[in-house]
Amino acid sequence: VYKRQVLHRGDVVVLDMEAGLEHMGRGTTEGMDQFIVVIEPGSRSVQTYKNVKRLAKDLGVKQVHVVANKIRDEKDEEFVKTHIPAEDLLGFIHYNTEIMDADRQGCSPYDYSKSAVDEIRKIKTTIDKIDDCDK
């Protein structure tokens, strides 16, 4: 459906795709110039990022960035920093019970967790800086 929409230069479309690589072979990546891969602090998740990055390059996607999710402590942050190149890492979203509470109540985390909103704003600022450099 999104391919049929008229987009203008500078427009942004965000697609939340299923975990894994299967969707990449279905033409869903056509016309995309960057991916944001959400990982968790674990070896399988890091390997998925590496596979996505390799396939993205083959498909002509120039940039693959990472948001690390469900970070519990400094060990998790250090694990991610050790395995993800600094230029690809957009930031961290820490494990947060308020997010789970919001989901159970059918509420947006944006309305429920100031700390999550602050972390997401930091990530958005990083994305904006990258976009400014690309212009």
Protein language model regions, located:
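Active-site loops and adjacent core secondary-structure elements that bind or stabilize anionic groups
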Residues: V1
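C-terminal alpha-helix
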Residues: E119-D134
